[in-house]
């Protein structure tokens, strides 16, 4: 039952486990308790399959503590039945049937009722859960495979369910060497074409792919196979569907009443009122719910930029300044800080990642340093500049050289994830492979070179499904990926390259331990615009051996290319994007080169390399015995 302390935390905006108190909860001796927040309702009834959807049978009682919570026991409710709250507003004659904001399960869309359900599961991921802290740490290798469950693979045109996906996805992710998967939102959503970003069920995995227990099995199985699971989570807005959160009790309860604050013009959706404490408790509880009940390893928070700015996607007269006259959404800032503090307090071995596309400062810095408190942030600037550079014909790249070097000016201002996400392969943008210039051979070579540069660049890695084998058409949610192309040599070679790149990345601490420290990076050749060559060192902590990375972004092979290196000994070529096995031309350095005692680039030793066309090479230093 809800204690006075629960009510206090709820109204203070700091209750992090409301899902244990509100919503529908089956009782061991039969029946279920129901509770819903509707402070402006005149009456609330539970209508469902057991009472033939009559509003005259199971009426709830309003608590007398001013919380606005209606509650009651329904004797005849059993697991699996559909239900809604029939709300009669105290404002006029407005009445509506609403889905339960705290429902654990819902009917498959287009049906909109909630389902009576419970969340028991015999978890078998103890080994993962007890040891995941180092795997999710900032100094760990992190190569994330972003996936949309409805369009990764299908069976005869139909969705795979959570259990089928668990086994086939785990096999594939292990084969490809990724460390984590990031799921585009699985929170219940009425419109499949929203990809999950128009959420109505903040505590329910979508029933399109099975039950809550099926999704628990999905996470459990991936954990048992050593794969972390991250979830896209959307506290930035919600859809206006009648059964959802909007105008919940005849008033703008979850959203602002003024459309200049409460309506999102770009997404045609409602914006949460982050200044309302009960709404904050709802959202914080939703975020922690997935970490608690589903053992997820982290949240990627969608649309953070839209939350931070009151004038986001608005014309000059379409927004209301904050109390200081500024454009910053102070309530959203405070909410995000409170959310991150709650996550890291309750689940310190998980992580939060912000999708934030502006230069808002200290997104991934602790709240006690006036930061937002996220663990990491997507580096949208790196993504835009890198793709803009790679889309240039190689002959023109010398005029855009800075687009690949500029990211290192700010690379350590935040804890960055480098994303090549679903956003880059939709809405007419084409596929990653399709963005690359040249003939088919050059397109594959360009994409391999980009991936090599990306995996060596400071920051964790994220790649959307299909990019790893060079999907030809841009992504669509209405079918599966073009798996058939992996039988073609160029695509198969790219797929082998990404798998090997992941293995090399995970084996070399220099490529991940100091992702967020300037001590982990050093330019060797930053200004060779005329040759479009880039060379840099990545360094591990504790004086470990550095790794040399060299990219040649033209189709001209270069021989006897001299670069300064800090150490004598053998520099072993651990991966070459132009290797024949990956579909390349086979140029290379025959396994590596010996450093000469010739000073160059201000360093005591140097190497003379063969740089293949459109390639990235990674060299590991091997000291002499």
Swiss-Prot record:
GO MF: 1,4-alpha-glucan branching enzyme activity; cation binding; hydrolase activity, hydrolyzing O-glycosyl compounds
GO biological process terms on file: glycogen biosynthetic process
This protein's record includes keyword Transferase: yes
Annotated metabolic or biological route of this protein: Glycan biosynthesis; glycogen biosynthesis
InterPro entries xrefs: A-amylase/branching_C (IPR006048), Branching_enzy (IPR037439), GlgB (IPR006407), GlgB_N_E_set_prok (IPR044143), Glyco_hydro_13_cat_dom (IPR006047), Glyco_hydro_13_N (IPR004193), Glyco_hydro_b (IPR013780), Glycoside_hydrolase_SF (IPR017853)
Free-text function comment from the UniProt entry: Catalyzes the formation of the alpha-1,6-glucosidic linkages in glycogen by scission of a 1,4-alpha-linked oligosaccharide from growing alpha-1,4-glucan chains and the subsequent attachment of the oligosaccharide to the alpha-1,6 position.
HAMAP family registered for this protein in UniProt: GlgB
Protein name as annotated: 1,4-alpha-glucan branching enzyme GlgB
């Amino acid at each position: 039952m809800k204690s006075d302390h629960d009510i206090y935390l709820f109204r203070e905006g700091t209750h992090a486990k409301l899902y244990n108190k509100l919503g529908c909860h089956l009782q061991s001796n039969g029946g279920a308790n129901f509770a819903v927040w509707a402070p402006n309702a005149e009456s609330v009834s539970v209508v469902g399959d057991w009472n033939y959807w009559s509003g005259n049978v199971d009426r709830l009682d309003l608590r007398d503590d001013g919380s606005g919570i209606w509650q009651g026991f329904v004797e005849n409710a059993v697991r699996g039945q559909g239900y809604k709250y029939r709300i009669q507003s105290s404002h006029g004659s407005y009445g509506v049937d609403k889905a339960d904001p705290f429902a654990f399960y819902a009917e498959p869309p287009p049906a909109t009722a909630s389902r009576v359900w419970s969340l028991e599961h015999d978890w078998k991921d103890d080994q993962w859960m007890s040891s995941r802290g180092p795997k999710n740490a900032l100094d760990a290798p992190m190569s994330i495979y972003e996936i949309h469950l409805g369009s990764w693979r299908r069976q005869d045109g139909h969705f795979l369910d959570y259990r089928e996906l668990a086994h086939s996805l785990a096999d594939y992710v292990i084969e490809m060497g990724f460390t984590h998967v990031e799921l585009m939102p699985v929170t219940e959503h009425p419109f499949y074409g929203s990809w999950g970003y128009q959420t109505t069920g903040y505590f329910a995995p979508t029933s399109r792919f099975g039950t809550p227990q099926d999704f628990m099995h999905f996470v459990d199985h991936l954990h048992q196979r050593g794969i972390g699971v991250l979830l896209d989570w959307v506290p930035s807005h919600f859809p206006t569907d009648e059964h959802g959160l909007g105008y919940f009790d005849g008033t703008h309860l979850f959203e602002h009443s003024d459309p200049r604050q409460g309506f999102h013009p770009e997404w045609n959706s409602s914006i949460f009122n982050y200044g309302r404490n009960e709404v904050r408790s709802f959202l914080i509880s939703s975020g922690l719910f997935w970490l608690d009940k589903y053992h997820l390893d982290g949240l990627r928070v969608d649309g953070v930029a839209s939350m931070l700015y009151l004038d986001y996607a608005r014309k000059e007269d379409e927004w209301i300044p904050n109390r200081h006259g500024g454009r910053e959404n102070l309530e959203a800032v405070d909410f995000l800080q409170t959310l991150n503090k709650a996550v890291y307090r309750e689940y310190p071995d998980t992580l939060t990642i912000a999708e934030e596309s502006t230069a808002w400062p200290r997104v991934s810095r602790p709240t006690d340093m006036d930061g937002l408190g996220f663990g990491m942030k997507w580096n949208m600037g790196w993504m835009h500049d890198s793709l803009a550079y790679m889309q240039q014909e190689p002959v023109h790249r010398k005029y855009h050289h800075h687009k690949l070097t500029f990211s290192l000016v700010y690379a350590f201002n935040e804890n960055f994830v480098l994303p090549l996400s679903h956003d880059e392969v939709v809405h007419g943008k084409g596929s990653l492979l399709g963005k690359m210039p040249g003939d088919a051979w050059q397109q594959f070579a360009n994409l391999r070179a980009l991936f090599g540069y990306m995996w060596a660049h400071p920051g964790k890695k994220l790649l959307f499904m299909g990019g790893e084998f060079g999907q030809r058409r841009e992504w669509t949610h209405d079918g599966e990926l073009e798996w058939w192309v992996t039988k073609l040599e160029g695509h198969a070679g790219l797929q082998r390259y990404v798998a090997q790149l992941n293995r090399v990345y995970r084996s070399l601490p220099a490529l991940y331990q100091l992702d967020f420290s300037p001590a982990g990076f050093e330019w060797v050749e930053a200004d060779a615009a005329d040759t479009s060559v880039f060379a840099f060192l990545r360094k591990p902590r504790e004086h470990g051996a550095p790794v040399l990375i060299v990219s040649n972004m033209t189709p001209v092979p270069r021989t006897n290319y001299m670069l300064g290196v800090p150490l004598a000994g053998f520099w072993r070529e651990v991966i070459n994007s132009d290797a024949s096995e990956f579909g390349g031309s086979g140029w290379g350095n025959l396994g590596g080169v010996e450093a000469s005692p010739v000073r160059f680039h201000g360093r005591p030793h140097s190497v003379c390399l063969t740089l293949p066309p459109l390639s990235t090479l990674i060299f590991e230093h091997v000291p002499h015995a």
